[in-house]
Structure formats: C-alpha cells, structure tokens
Amino acid sequence: MDKPLISGIFLWISSFFRFKHQILSMPTAGYSGTPLIRKLGIKPGWKLRLIGAPADYFRWLSEDVSAQVCPPRAIPDFVHLFAVTRRDFEREMSLLVGICGKNPQLVIWVSWYKKSSGKATDLTEDVIRGYALANGLVDIKVCAVSEEWSGLKLVVPVAKR
C-alpha cells in the first residue's frame, strides 16, 4: 500500500473515533431528546438519594445536582434506585416504602436494564409495577434513562398523601 492511502485510512479512523467520543460524551436523554433532568423532574433544593447509580449518572443529567445529594439518614424528596436483580430491588424498596410514611411526597424512580442492553437481569417493568401496587404506590411515568437503563416513576397516590 502506498503512503497517501495509509495516511488517508489513518485520518479517517482517527476522525471516526474522535466523533464517537464526542457523541458518547454528550448527556444521554434517550429517544425524545428531552434532558434527563427534566424527564426525571428533579427540582432545585430537593434532597436526592441515589442507590446503585452508574458512575456517569451526573453527566447524564446535564446539570450539576451533586450538592443536593443528602446524607444517608436524611429523608429525601427524590430517590433514584438502579437495581440489577429482583432481590436487590425488593430489599431497597422495603426501606423506601418506609420512607414514604415519613415523606408521602417522595418521588421514587426505579431503573432496570433494558432487554436491548444484553445484560442479565430478572427485574422487569412488570415486577416493579406489581411490587409498587402491592405496597401502596402507583407508577405514573416511564422513560429511557440511558441506552442501557429504563426507569419507572413511583409515588404515593394523591388520595393517600
């Protein structure tokens, strides 16, 4: 192969990976293009609790809300639980249902791996919804959190707040 051809191929490959890096570095908003922070409804001043969140969670939000993360013993206004297994989900939710008694306005987002992620999980939207309904919560919204994660929003029904 001649040098100009090799140089051209190298230039194309390096441009491709630079472009791929730029795309992957952008905040993920799912299919709608709506910023994740808006999809989740995170409000300024809310106390946030994250459980099992991926390392790049704050980058997905497109706004820095890391200062709103509350200490473990504080009663949060917003919880985002990332669960890989049904067992982990049920263990964490048993604690969160108790917090709903102290803060009936609590917003709980539960995220699980999408089928398209290729990750093994026994947790599904139906499992989450069934647990919520059996424990006095209702689901009011679903969204794509990232390319790998879906999310279901759970709250105490208005009549019980």
Predicted regions span which residues?
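Class I S-adenosyl-L-methionine
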Residues: 136-161
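Active-site-adjacent loop/helix micro-motif of nuclease/hydrolase catalytic cores
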Residues: 81-94
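Short acidic low-complexity segments
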Residues: 66-76
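Conserved Class I S-adenosyl-L-methionine
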Residues: 123-139
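N-terminal, charge-rich interaction modules
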Residues: 23-60
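Mid-chain, well-packed structural core segment of small domains
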Residues: 92-123
